[in-house]
UniProtKB/Swiss-Prot annotation:
Transmembrane segments: 17-37, 41-61, 92-112, 135-155, 158-178, 216-236, 263-283
Organism: Nitrosococcus oceani (strain ATCC 19707 / BCRC 17464 / JCM 30415 / NCIMB 11848 / C-107)
An example Gene Ontology CC term for this record: plasma membrane
Subcellular localization(s) per the UniProt record: Cell inner membrane
High-level lineage: Bacteria, Pseudomonadati, Pseudomonadota, Gammaproteobacteria, Chromatiales
Protein name per its UniProtKB record: 4-hydroxybenzoate octaprenyltransferase
A Pfam cross-reference name: UbiA
Length: 285
């Protein structure tokens, strides 16, 4: 039993929690702005737990979708489905179980949030298959991750205002950037096995395109702060985040997969300082 639990934890990537934080940060941005710095405690707990559950579910369905590809990619060759330690049926049952628990939590919220959750579940379930059909699965991941933003506004305020959609777009831009960095790690393997990604699409222009996307993201976050009346601490956080974006571009210069992965991981700090700026604004307002 213990060994099975370890395998299921690996399927859910509980040993690599950075993905949970990358999904959590924009959710917290949204909850703090929607709640003017004081989100409803029940809503906050539901979303934190829901983020962990749905990120875990996303990892499981991703491994199920990639079970034929992962044995041929160096980074993924030891995943449970790739090695045969877990079966496809186990993965699907685990995915369904995680989604059911997450939906049970959503039922504690208002009808608008419940309705939005169906679109979120569809995005999460279909994202892993996008790399077969489009070079933009990273943007699709952004939509899946970003869907927590309108849901957070709906849960906190009962509406989905323009600010929610602007934050959603910002999250799509952000996820496209950091998941492109992630895709750059596997680019050579992905070319061999025939799957698509923005890393492949951008090719030698990857640094330029991701830098432009980061610039657009920072400008959008600046505009959101202006619209919402956020003050000094928010812009301080945004300035630090801009520094992190520059550092990520510096890491890409070496053209080494290990540095691409470091650039990906650094986005956890990017998301954290944005949240810190939002939280400090409301604490000191």
């Amino acid at each position: 039993m213990k060994q099975r639990l370890i395998i299921y934890a690996q399927l859910m990537r509980l040993d690599r929690p950075v993905g949970i934080f990358l999904l959590l940060w924009p959710t917290l941005w949204a909850l703090w702005i929607a709640g003017a710095g004081q989100p409803d405690p029940k809503v906050l707990l539901v979303f934190v737990a829901g983020v962990a559950l749905m990120r875990s579910a996303g990892c499981v369905i991703n491994d199920f979708a990639d079970r034929a590809f992962d044995p041929h990619v160096k980074r993924t060759i030891n995943r449970p489905l790739a090695t045969g330690k877990a079966s496809s049926q186990e993965a699907l049952l685990l995915f369904a179980g995680l989604c059911l628990v997450a939906f049970g939590l959503v039922l504690l919220l208002n009808p608008l949030t419940i309705g939005l959750s169906f679109a979120g579940a569809l995005l999460a379930a279909t994202y892993p298959f996008m790399k077969r059909y489009t070079h933009w699965p990273q943007a699709y991941l952004g939509a899946a991750f970003g869907w927590a933003v309108p849901m957070a506004f709906a849960a906190q305020t009962g509406t989905v205002p323009i600010a929610a959609w602007l934050l959603f777009i910002a999250t799509v831009l952000w996820a496209t950037v950091y998941d492109t960095f992630y895709g750059m790690v596997d680019r050579e393997d992905d070319l061999l096995i025939g799957v698509k990604s923005t890393a492949i699409l951008f090719g030698e222009g990857d640094r330029l395109v991701t830098a432009l996307l980061q610039g657009a993201l920072l400008l959008l976050l600046f505009w959101i702060g202006y619209r919402e009346g956020l003050g000094f601490y928010y812009y301080l956080g945004l300035a630090i985040a801009a520094g992190f974006a520059g550092y990520q571009q510096y890491l890409l210069r070496s053209r080494e997969p290990a540095q691409y992965f470091r650039a990906f991981l650094n986005n956890n700090a990017f998301g954290a300082v944005i949240f810190g700026g939002i939280a400090l604004h409301y604490l000191t307002a």
